């Protein structure tokens, strides 16, 4: 709303707010460059990869979302309910997407994935944030399976149960969320000790202390939870505080 930019989703998406639902191979022009939509279902049914075509018409990079990571691919077990498919069927669909849309692209294309090491969206992601597609073709286990059956078996093997908040994430992605400005307006106010006591006792607020462990150890509010900002803050909070509507008082 601030910039006037329109939101673009991949084919089959059904958001509850205004957005462009792109078609497979649809091209969007941004100045002198183009973005081509490659529908790559498997992680979810609307999952898409966005191919960057530069001013000279050269295919330069892909923004691969949750389809292709560095060292891994998107887990195919999260959209079973919405897609009315088994995880094996979704994994097979992901294999077909990779083989038909990603593997034929040139080796010098740069891969920009949506997640990196530490994310629960994959099991074998590298810490690097960018790589060539050619190197991924050589080193990514998921791109080196001899057939669909082997791919499905290897991709599903060893997947940990998804964090419990993932289901709510899906609903928020579809339904929309309050603007960041609105969140900051209501959530960035200093609280007095009386305010905190009122929120904890009457609103059921949880106290989340974001300081490092050493500072927390020196003194803390009883019954508070310490998850330091350094490290995997977001995944730990998501794992330990399952209800995304849980009122939280931050100690920083």
Description of each model-found segment:
Residues 17-20, 72-73, 234-241:
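Short, charged, surface-exposed secondary-structure boundary motifs
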Residues 1-39, 53, 58-60, 243:
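Active-site HxH/HxHxD metal-binding segment of metal-dependent hydrolases
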Residues 8-11, 114, 251:
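Generic beta-sheet signal
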Residues 44-162:
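Metallo-beta-lactamase
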Residues 91, 104-106, 120-252:
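Cytosolic catalytic domains that perform sulfur/thiol-centered chemistry
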Residues 1, 39, 43-47, 115, ...:
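Histidine-centered active-site/metal-ligand motif
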Residues 36, 46-48, 206:
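Short beta-strand micro-motifs in enzyme catalytic cores
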Residues 7, 19-21, 62, 111, ...:
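Conserved beta-strand scaffold positions in the cores of enzyme catalytic domains, especially
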């Amino acid at each position: 709303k601030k910039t006037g930019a329109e939101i673009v989703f991949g084919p089959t998406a059904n958001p509850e707010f205004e957005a462009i639902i792109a078609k497979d191979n649809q091209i969007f022009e941004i100045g002198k460059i183009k973005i081509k939509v490659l529908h790559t279902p498997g992680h979810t049914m609307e999952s898409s990869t966005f191919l960057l075509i530069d001013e000279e018409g050269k295919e330069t990079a892909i923004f691969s979302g949750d389809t292709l990571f560095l060292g891994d691919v998107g887990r195919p077990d999260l959209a079973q309910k919405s897609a009315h498919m088994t995880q094996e069927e979704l994994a097979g669909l992901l294999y077909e997407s990779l083989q038909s849309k990603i593997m034929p692209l040139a080796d010098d294309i740069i891969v920009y994935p949506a997640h990196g090491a530490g994310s629960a969206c994959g099991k074998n992601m590298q810490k690097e944030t960018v790589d060539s597609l050619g190197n991924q073709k050589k080193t990514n286990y998921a791109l080196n399976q001899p057939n669909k059956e082997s791919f499905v078996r290897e991709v599903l093997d060893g997947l940990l149960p998804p964090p419990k908040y993932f289901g709510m994430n899906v609903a928020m992605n579809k339904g929309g969320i309050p603007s960041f400005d609105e969140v900051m307006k209501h959530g960035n106010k200093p609280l007095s000790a009386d305010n905190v006591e009122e929120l904890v006792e009457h609103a059921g607020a949880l106290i989340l202390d974001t300081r490092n462990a050493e500072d927390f150890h020196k003194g803390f509010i009883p019954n508070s939870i310490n998850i330091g900002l350094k490290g995997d803050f977001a995944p730990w909070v998501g794992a330990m505080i399952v209800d995304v509507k849980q009122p939280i008082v931050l100690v920083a």
